[in-house]
């Protein structure tokens, strides 16, 4: 039955294949030097083909854009050049700050989308605002953007009353591509976003139901003469760091201060990026440090399971789909945050684990094959005589074969080897000497992006027979202008173990069905509205229902891009063991009894305001039954844009849980004021505060960044953790310190 589904997916892919609306562009090599000054007056620009006639994508996907855009492309031995004339009144600019890598939908922008591999899945985005603020991102799985990726490129902008003019130079060394003897062509698209008119437009039309940056909808860039073969592409990225840390060690029972320690430390390390071939890259790292990476945003965890946090460290991002996208979101065989990060059992915080060295080879072998190899070694950490984390070696091998244009058949092997030597018997408890995963999967993506699907089978291996299991899943979805329907099935064996992956729950079968219908009314304010039904239902292997989340929803999107979702849900949870929904487990309260099912229902309202306005926000309000009690939850974010200086914001989360006596009741607050300032295009500052009563922690993270050269920075980072609330019968008060750290770090990017 399971094996028979793969040919069915292939068949559906073939019948879903549709021709794209063809757009073509020929690019010629420049015979003159291009001076990057925002004034495209060189002779190469006068003879280059002019691209116009951008098509609207939002709020409607018919008709031409209301503001004219003119694009020209040329190249020389080192760079791909783009010249753009974007007509727009200077007084109507929306540019929130001068900081690089601004989020999508927050600024007026011109985006260049490049897909040199022509797979419709993996590419590059380069964006520029009217004030010459840059952003770049990797694109994987057709639409997913990784703005954490940084690389070198240049741009210049001139502003006029009725238009802004940009010149962009992208080094060929920055891109990954191959040069063939015959036809040379890339897939490309260009996107323009203007917030004051709520309009998004593209050169190659993109249907409104899909993201505008979707690589399934691209035109073809033909090179009249082949692009240059990239020469030796080697970049060295050394760093040096100095830090001072204060720790406040307290008695775990009385919380009396036992010892206050302070220590200075310094270190050096770095990365190297080596282009093995124009489309295959080797990343090496020695003693890496990620102290400048933005801290995780804390959330109130009311569930029984581990929460997922995204990877932000740049070393793991390029070609990340080759490593991170296997499996479903709840069954990832490899999760890069298992490397170099671990929970300290004494403090409850995630802390850095020293990485000694590592390497990562990823990219295309040829037009049909991609490969990913990763090996990293971490250092042993001993917290005390009872708690330790063994040093570990992580190895990942992946291989992907392109099929039918945008689909792929892939295999993965993951190996984690724990070095248990040197640990005492207590410290060894719970660790295997090794754990391995082998898996195979097929991903379906039709040419017109209407059909998507996934099929996989993974198996785990460990010395302990009780940790040798499997997981399998199947997904098929169909999306067109009005109809969206999908069905997923996932099965996770009780013995399936992925120590280097993310598998928060075992021993379940999961069904995830959904169907929705979108309407496009001719209305002054409403752009679309959608009704739908979605389910997330878990069963044990003997078909006992363990969890159910059934939702009926109404989704409304306004023409100014404000969105609202009304949802009514019916939930069911079977507790196999006692559980405190507050996760506090405080004395004097009892957990809910296990071996019992709880049915409860409620409603939720979400609203996200338009980013057009300087004052904006989002809110989610949930109210209803919760196990045998009630829950009121309010969470969201409100921000003010002082353009182009910066943004001041406050995130908030409030959870009120009321269960009948003698069970728990609690109010949880999570407040996160933050400020992001851009003094120039090279000097930035940010401050982020997180007040979390559930974790009883108040975190401060402040960062000053000076970009003194392209992709080269000096960071000054201050981090402080203290108590958010007093603890009865102890010396702990609000703001009683836990630890403090100040770090000065310099990173330099050197092209060899």
Enumerate the predicted regions with their spans.
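Exposed, low-structure sequence patches enriched in small/polar residues
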Residues: 354-356, 362, 448-752
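Sec-dependent signal peptide recognition
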Residues: 2-8
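Structural preference for beta-rich elements and adjacent junctions enriched in aromatics
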Residues: 19-402, 410-411
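A generic structural motif
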Residues: 172-176, 417, 461, 625
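Surface-exposed extracellular loop regions of Gram-negative outer-membrane beta-barrel proteins
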Residues: 230-283, 370, 394-461, 521, ...
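Catalytic-domain carbohydrate-binding cleft regions of carbohydrate-active enzymes
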Residues: 187, 259-263, 281, 290-297, ...
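Outer-membrane beta-barrel and related beta-rich outer-membrane complex signature
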Residues: 138, 198-203, 250, 294-302, ...
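Hydrophobic h-region of N-terminal signal peptides that target proteins for export
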Residues: 9-17
